[in-house]
Amino acid sequence: MSDEEVEHVEEEYEEEEEAQEEAPPPPAEVPEVHEEVHEVHEPEEVQEEEKPRPRLTAPKIPEGEKVDFDDIQKKRQNKDLMELQALIDSHFEARKKEEEELVALKERIEKRRAERAEQQRIRAEKERERQNRLAEEKARREEEDAKRRAEDDLKKKKALSSMGANYSSYLAKADQKRGKKQTAREMKKKVLAERRKPLNIDHLSEDKLRDKAKELWDTLYQLETDKFEYGEKLKRQKYDITNLRSRIDQAQKHSKKAGTAPKGKVGGRWK
């Protein structure tokens, strides 16, 4: 018996089972009740004809051949196994593909990481070279500056040694000027310390703080006014000194032309 005939027989068998399941159950037998029926002249009712029921027939089995249901069941199982095996194979193929993609992704990440590390190494090496170059240039400039300072000091020492005795007087005058400047600076600090009084306002109330602030403001305003007046006075004095010096210079020029030099302070000395 061929596979097609077996499948045909199997389909007919399945159709027969489905028809039996869908067929309604046979009506229950109603006992006959003998009652007297009175004849009534009524219109005749049309009796509904019962629908013909499908006749169930057993599947035709070809004569001379036997159906092997075990063989059919075995083929079904083999078919299911083949489908299951196909699903398993497709699952493993997809899994293998995902693993390959994951491996490729890891390789790309490692490659990118190595490239980034190489770039950082090159950048660090260039930065180190730049720092070394800057350090060398700085050391060279410092060496040149030290050499130039040494040469300048040597020239100064030679010039001062050539001055001879005037060097000691020069140092004495320089020390004297420094002493005067130091003394004036110390006097200024002393005067400022005397004038500057400590500001104790922790115990003052709000009104007294306002009064104190107004007092300080008035003092500051007065100081600024005095400063401005002193500045204007100093400007006038400088202007007067400049005019006097110009007059003295003109008088000296006229006296030189006349041949006689008047007595006056010239070059810091009286003549």
UniProtKB/Swiss-Prot annotation:
Keyword Calcium appears in the UniProt entry: no
Modified residues (N-acetylserine): S2
Any one cellular-component term (Gene Ontology): troponin complex
Assigned keywords, A-Z: Acetylation, Muscle protein, Phosphoprotein
GO biological process: regulation of muscle contraction; skeletal muscle contraction
Ranges of compositional bias, category Acidic residues: 1-21
Pfam families the UniProt entry points to: Troponin (PF00992)
Basic and acidic residues bias (residue ranges): 31-53, 62-74, 113-155, 183-194
UniProt modified residues of type Phosphotyrosine: Y221
Annotated transmembrane regions: none
Modified residues annotated as Phosphoserine in this record: S2, S90, S161, S168, S169, S205
Renumbered residue ranges of the record's region Disordered: 1-74, 113-194, 248-271
Lineage: superkingdom: Eukaryota
GO molecular function: tropomyosin binding; troponin C binding; troponin I binding
Family affiliation: Belongs to the troponin T family.
UniProt function note: Troponin T is the tropomyosin-binding subunit of troponin, the thin filament regulatory complex which confers calcium-sensitivity to striated muscle actomyosin ATPase activity.
Protein name (database record): Troponin T, fast skeletal muscle
Source species of the chain: Bos taurus (Bovine)
Name of the coding gene: Tnnt3
